[in-house]
């Protein structure tokens, strides 16, 4: 049998989370920029109604499993009272310089049972020592250590490649810190990653999107691929990040018309989670420090629709082998199938066919697919059938099917299927 890449227990837990909420919040929230210069005065930061509880409450209500906060974006402004620089909440008027956005968000997530993770931009447009590689590596390692030791447990540490094209960092040092202080946290895309960037900011994964990879794109601004360190595991699943407002990661006033449509958000779910990836949907808090009602409402409507579609399977089976047949007590209308491999055994299926039993006892092919991995959601025109059959056409080893479920979403109580 071919030796297959296998996920760690931490990777499997992360993949089971499936849905994360990104919160881009910081200096840019008050300046109207996407990328700050690092010259904006700390006095600009003053979210007078800041409420991390509201963020976590929305995440919980919508059904997100984890929340990632931009602890430091490219402008270098830190949302925690770091000892490494004066360019932080400590120098802002907010809470008289005594506030800690990261700390309050971590506690709110814990209170609501939401996993917490941090984004820490390697590129720093404010820090004077950035041009000196050794000095900045030490500076960045200190910031990373503060976050890893002060705000855990963390489910993910997000390393953004934007602005770092061609720049070398001491990733071995940074990765060793994560492994030491937060061994179960996922490491995003850089150094020795345990998860990777899908390669776009549309929330849509290519298909097939295999869980094994040898590299990933650095950023949207170059086609160059990252050189990961040799210790990188072969199993590196993808995460799809996308803002709920078209091409706007940070909040700006009077841009509600940029909110993605409900139909687009549903399609993003099918193109991310439905292709075996995690979805990280950005809801940016506003200058008050609150997630706008319109943004929260759009996310909640999306997630409620998803739950309505998939909370009540017509039938579910599991097992192994090259063929599995699901039978119904009577002819049943079906338009969706969800497949999951037991990825503890690796990604074994390379191609498959789904068939429906016909009235004369024969079989009609509905579709063919390739990657299954953690999850594959297949949509098709509604059929009336007494049985569905999954046939494995190509595989690396005997498949272990964790879940084979059938659904009918073409119901009057659901939004029209897109």
Regions found by a protein language model. Give the residues of each.
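Mature catalytic domains of secreted/periplasmic carbohydrate-active enzymes
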Residues: 1-382, 391-418
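Short, conserved beta-strand segments of beta-strand-rich sandwich/propeller modules, principally
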Residues: 387-389
């Amino acid at each position: 049998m071919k030796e297959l890449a296998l996920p760690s227990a931490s990777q499997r837990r992360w993949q089971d989370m499936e849905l994360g909420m990104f919160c881009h919040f910081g200096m840019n929230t008050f300046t109207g920029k996407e990328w700050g210069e690092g010259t904006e005065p700390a006095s600009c930061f003053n979210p007078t109604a800041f409420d991390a509880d509201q963020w976590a409450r929305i995440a919980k209500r919508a059904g997100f499993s984890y929340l990632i906060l931009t602890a430091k974006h490219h402008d270098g402004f830190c949302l925690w009272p770091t000892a490494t620089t004066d360019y932080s909440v400590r120098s802002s008027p907010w809470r008289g310089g005594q506030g800690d956005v990261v700390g309050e968000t971590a506690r709110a997530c814990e209170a609501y049972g939401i996993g917490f993770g941090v984004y820490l931009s390697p590129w720093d447009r404010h820090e004077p020592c950035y041009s000196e590689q050794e000095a900045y590596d030490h500076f960045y390692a200190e910031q990373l250590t503060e976050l890893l030791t002060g705000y855990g447990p963390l489910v993910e540490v997000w390393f953004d490649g934007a602005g770092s094209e061609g720049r070398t960092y001491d990733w071995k040092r940074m990765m060793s810190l994560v492994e030491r202080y937060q061994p179960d946290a996922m490491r995003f895309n850089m150094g020795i990653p345990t998860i990777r960037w899908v390669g776009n900011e549309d929330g849509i994964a290519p298909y097939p999107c295999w869980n094994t990879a040898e590299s990933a794109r650095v950023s949207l601004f170059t086609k160059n691929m990252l050189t990961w360190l040799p210790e990188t595991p072969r199993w590196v699943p993808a995460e799809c990040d996308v803002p709920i407002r078209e091409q706007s990661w940070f909040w700006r006033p009077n841009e509600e018309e940029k909110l993605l449509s409900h139909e687009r958000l549903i399609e993003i779910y099918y193109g991310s989670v439905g292709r075996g990836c995690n979805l990280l949907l950005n809801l940016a808090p506003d200058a008050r420090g609150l997630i706008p009602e319109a943004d929260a409402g759009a996310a909640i409507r999306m997630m409620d629709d998803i739950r309505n579609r998939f909370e009540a399977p017509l039938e579910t089976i599991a097992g192994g082998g090259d063929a599995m047949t699901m039978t119904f007590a009577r002819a049943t209308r079906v338009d969706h199938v969800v497949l999951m491999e037991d990825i503890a055994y690796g990604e074994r299926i390379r191609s498959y066919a789904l068939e429906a039993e016909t009235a004369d006892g024969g079989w009609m092919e509905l579709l063919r697919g390739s990657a299954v991995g953690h999850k594959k959601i297949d949509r098709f025109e509604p059929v009336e059938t007494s049985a569905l059959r999954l046939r494995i056409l190509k595989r690396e080893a005997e498949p272990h099917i964790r879940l084979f479920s059938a659904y009918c979403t073409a119901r009057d109580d659901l939004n029209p299927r897109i």
